[in-house]
Amino acid sequence: MLLIPAIDLKDGQCVRLKQGDMDQATIFSEDPAAMARKWVDLGARRLHLVDLNGAFAGKPKNLEAIEAILGEVGDEIPVQLGGGIRSLETIEKYLDAGLSYVIIGTAAVKDPGFLRDACSAFAGNIIVGLDAKDGKVATDGWSKLTGHEVIDLAQKFEDYGVESIVYTDIGRDGMLQGINIEATVKLAQAVGIPVIASGGLSNIVDIEKLCEVEDEGIEGVICGRAIYSGDLDFAAAQKRADELNGELDDA
């Protein structure tokens, strides 16, 4: 089970939002590259970046910070990024800069042909981000709820060739209420590609619960507010996940 620290970028700073609200941003660092270094030194094996300004603008907006992070840790671990990815040119630019994966969210829902083209042009590098509330997919920085069922879209996008799915329960994100394990497992069981859980991770108990269902196809979990607020000790949590993984493998 991969524990993947999130670095959310707003105006070049590392922040956390409450339920995707740009007006409710807490700044945790003015040096995102130093934050990336911290998580890698604590044992992170992948990083999750979000260009928050980009998500709302529809184009890259935190390039300098992203390049600084890649310069710091990009040679050591895979880095994935979402937010504002709406063109093949943007994907190519990001992959050339050293990103391992790009996450397509809103654009995948609104323009499935773009996602299909991206999977074809950059096979193995495309992750789809599905943000849902009560099983329905949301777009545009969570501001619009669609009528699409998350499982229907996930299966369609799997057919296109996406590498994995980041599934966020937006009712819980940034609220420290616990991961929606049931919904995440349901999605993972419905597809044959890995699912990365996101939204609401609050403590070590969530990690233990996720490890129990890892074999359903849950590859990892994105760690946001809990590791910044101190509710979750990242290094201890990754160690615990590895221990549980070993125990389950031995069973």
Swiss-Prot record:
A GO biological-process term: L-histidine biosynthetic process
GO molecular function: 1-(5-phosphoribosyl)-5-[(5-phosphoribosylamino)methylideneamino]imidazole-4-carboxamide isomerase activity
Gene Ontology CC: cytoplasm
Top-level class of the enzyme under EC nomenclature: isomerase
PANTHER family linked to this entry: 1-(5-PHOSPHORIBOSYL)-5-[(5-PHOSPHORIBOSYLAMINO)METHYLIDENEAMINO] IMIDAZOLE-4-CARBOXAMIDE ISOMERASE
HAMAP family, alphabetized: HisA (MF_01014)
Family listed: Belongs to the HisA/HisF family.
Full protein name: 1-(5-phosphoribosyl)-5-[(5-phosphoribosylamino)methylideneamino] imidazole-4-carboxamide isomerase
Taxonomy of the source species: Bacteria, Pseudomonadati, Pseudomonadota, Betaproteobacteria, Burkholderiales
Gene symbol of the encoding locus: hisA
